[in-house]
């Protein structure tokens, strides 16, 4: 997901999660960049393009990735969220396996 193509509803949801109640271009640009970085990171962990608009592991992880990135704490994100990252990978593997057998 490119920073210029962040769905407006995703940007609004992330800002809400971060308790950002104001609107300004600089904040939106920063959060959009963090969302783009987070989706690239999580897509690489998930093995493909993930759905961040639907509730589930990818969306949950993205929200917290952006929170950690905004707070300059990405060095501990993967360690703190390893169990959720693995759960996301397992869920995707099961879903992909089910599609192959159908």
Where do the model's predicted regions map?
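Divalent metal-cofactor coordination and adjacent catalytic microenvironments
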Residues: 1-102
């Amino acid at each position: 997901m490119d920073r210029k193509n962040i769905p407006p509803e995703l940007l609004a949801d992330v800002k809400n999660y971060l308790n950002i109640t104001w609107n300004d271009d600089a904040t939106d640009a920063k959060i959009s960049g963090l969302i783009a970085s987070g989706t690239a990171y999580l897509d690489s962990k998930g093995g493909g393009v993930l759905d961040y608009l639907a509730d589930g592991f990818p969306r949950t992880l993205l929200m917290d990735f952006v929170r950690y990135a905004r707070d300059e704490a990405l060095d501990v994100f993967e360690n703190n969220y390893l169990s959720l990252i693995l759960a996301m990978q397992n869920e995707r593997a099961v879903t992909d396996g089910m599609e192959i057998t159908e």
